[in-house]
From Swiss-Prot:
Keywords: Cytoplasm, Endonuclease, Hydrolase, Metal-binding, Nuclease, Ribosome biogenesis, rRNA processing, Zinc
Encoding gene, per UniProt annotation: ybeY
PROSITE patterns in the cross-refs: UPF0054
GO cellular component: cytoplasm
Species of origin: Salmonella paratyphi A (strain AKU_12601)
Protein name (database record): Endoribonuclease YbeY
Location(s) in or outside the cell: Cytoplasm
Lineage, broadest ranks: Bacteria, Pseudomonadati, Pseudomonadota, Gammaproteobacteria, Enterobacterales
Length: 157
C-alpha cells in the first residue's frame, strides 16, 4: 500500500476559503502513488510577496506565480521518501481560476497535480515534454472527477 505524507504549511495571511488538509491529501494521493510507493511532500500556501521573491530568486521571473516545485535530491546511496516542496500562491490560483472560468477547487487540484508531476521529474520545457505532462495531468484530473484542465486551450486550437 502506498503512503503519501503531507506537511501542509499555511503561510498566507487569510486562511478563509482555502482547501483543507484532507483535500490536499486527496489530490496528492491521486498523483504520487502511480509513480512511487512512499513520499513525503510539503505544500506551503503563500501570499504574492513570498511567491514573487521565490520566483525571482529561483527562476529569474519578477512576478508571483501559481506553483513552484522544489524537488528533494537525496545524497547518492541514501534512500529517502522525501519528494520535495510545492509552494502555491493563493492569490494567483484564485485569480487564474476566475480569469479562466474554472471552478476554484478544480484549479487548486490542478496546481497540486501539476506541481507533483514536476517533483516526480516531469517538465514542459519543449513541446514533446509539455504534451506528455499535460496528457498525464488530464488523465489524473479526470480520474479524480474533475474536467480536463486544458479543455479551453484544446477548443481554441
Amino acid at each position: 500500500m502506498s503512503q503519501v505524507i503531507l506537511d501542509l504549511q499555511l503561510a498566507c495571511e487569510n486562511h478563509a476559503g482555502l482547501p483543507d488538509e484532507a483535500q490536499f491529501q486527496r489530490w496528492l494521493d491521486g498523483v504520487i502513488p502511480q509513480f512511487q510507493e512512499e513520499a513525503e511532500v510539503t505544500i506551503r500556501l503563500v501570499d504574492e510577496a513570498e511567491s514573487h521573491d521565490l520566483n525571482l530568486t529561483y527562476r529569474g521571473k519578477d512576478k508571483p506565480t501559481n506553483v513552484l516545485s522544489f524537488p528533494f535530491e537525496a545524497p547518492p546511496g541514501i534512500e529517502m521518501p522525501l519528494l520535495g516542496d510545492l509552494i502555491i500562491c493563493r492569490q494567483v490560483v484564485e485569480q487564474e481560476a476566475q480569469e479562466q472560468s474554472k471552478p476554484l477547487e478544480a484549479h487548486w487540484a490542478h496546481m497540486v497535480v501539476h506541481g507533483s508531476l514536476h517533483l516526480l521529474g516531469y517538465d514542459h520545457i519543449d513541446d514533446d515534454e509539455a504534451e506528455e505532462m499535460e496528457s498525464l495531468e488530464t488523465e489524473i484530473m479526470l480520474a479524480m472527477g474533475y474536467e480536463d484542465p486544458y479543455i479551453a486551450e484544446k477548443i481554441t486550437e
